[in-house]
Regions:
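Phosphate-binding/switch region of NTP-binding enzymes
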Residues: 20-24, 143-179
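Short acidic/His/Gly/Ser-rich catalytic and metal-binding motifs that mark active-site loops
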Residues: 56-58, 108-118, 161-165
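A short acidic, glycine-rich active-site loop
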Residues: 76, 123-139, 179
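Conserved P-loop NTPase nucleotide-binding/switch module
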Residues: 102-133
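The first long alpha-helix at the start of the GST-like C-terminal all-alpha domain
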Residues: 103, 141-142
């Protein structure tokens, strides 16, 4: 059966945002500021996946905090389990939760790798043939986050990129440390 055209209709766009940097650079605070504004504008709540157990600080008022001294209001899931995160975020009700924050995606990628229980190579690395099974649940979560109607903010650790010029490694850039 051939594909058919349907009348285009406006729909609410959902932000998909990545935020990365070194430890202590303000990723969690920035994510909460964005999430709070998005949730307030959309009339919903924030679902915050916390793999670092660092959001409790932001769930209380801190008068000394110059920017946003009052407590943030969000629902938290404390885990580093990729399976738990996938199950929890795919069961969220978009009518209630308008924003999902994953902090940190780096831990979830590491959990996917750590879940590998097969035999390692002679060099003590995961064999090439095993990577498909390792990546599948991680990619499934990422696909859901990209396709879901909710705003999504993903925090991750910074990874430095080096090139070796004349035997001397030189930093040439940074990326988010995830798959």
């Amino acid at each position: 059966m051939p594909a058919t055209f349907v009348k285009a209709a406006p729909k609410q766009a959902a932000l998909k945002m990545g935020c990365y940097g070194p430890t202590g650079s303000g990723k969690t605070f920035t994510a909460l500021l964005f999430a709070e504004g998005l949730a307030e504008a959309a009339g919903g709540r924030v679902a915050y996946v916390d793999s670092e157990s660092g959001t409790d600080f932001y769930a209380k008022a801190v008068p000394q905090r110059n920017v946003h001294p009052e407590a943030f209001d969000f629902d938290a899931l404390y885990t580093r389990s990729l399976a738990d995160v996938t199950e929890a975020v795919t069961s969220l009700d978009p009518a209630i939760h308008k924003v999902i924050v994953i902090d940190s995606i780096t831990h979830l990628w590491e959990a996917a790798i750590d879940a590998y229980e097969g035999k390692l190579t002679g060099a003590n690395t995961i064999p090439l043939q095993a990577w498909g099974a390792i990546k599948k649940p991680y990619k499934s979560l990422i696909k859901f986050l990209l396709d879901c109607p909710m705003h999504v903010i993903i925090c991750g650790r910074q990874k430095n990129i080096f090139e070796d010029d004349d035997g001397q490694p030189t930093k040439v850039g940074v990326v988010m440390k995830a798959e």
